[in-house]
Amino acid sequence: DDKYFADKLACSATPNADGYYTVKDHPIISAGISIGEDMSFRIMVEEGYENGSLKYYYIGVNGRVEGEGTIGTDTQGNSIFRIYNVNPQRADLIYVIQYYDADGNAIGAPKEISVLTYFEGFYNMEAGKNEDVEARKTFIANFLEYCASAMERSYADFPKETLDGKTWQYR
């Protein structure tokens, strides 16, 4: 069954017996960052989309870099794709992610995520009940400080390297 995408809904190209079309939400339902020994994006997909793949690209100092997410499940059993090798030096890079079904057809519009936009959204998110907003702000500030230190280290190691005409120091 061919699928196409309109607004935020994936639609079947063939109507059902009653003349209506099957409409599903976008396969990608959330994106987040996991920080542990390393950093990764975690992309949750809607139930029923665990048999597909998630491809991504970003444009860095070495041009366009492409990759494919690794599928797994979280502790609640949700299907999660992970994009590894995300690091503070790439905090300002925009990753463009696209879900593909098992047949290789792109489903839904591409989505964009970056470390900085994730934390901007996290910072501006409405506080939950009994949440310590100051702790959230401190976490974000500490993480951005960590990113800045990593950028300074990159500048020391690669002073002439540029991205979009900007050195590590400028970025």
PLM segments and residue spans:
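Short, surface-exposed linear motifs at loops/turns and structural transition points
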Residues: 1-171
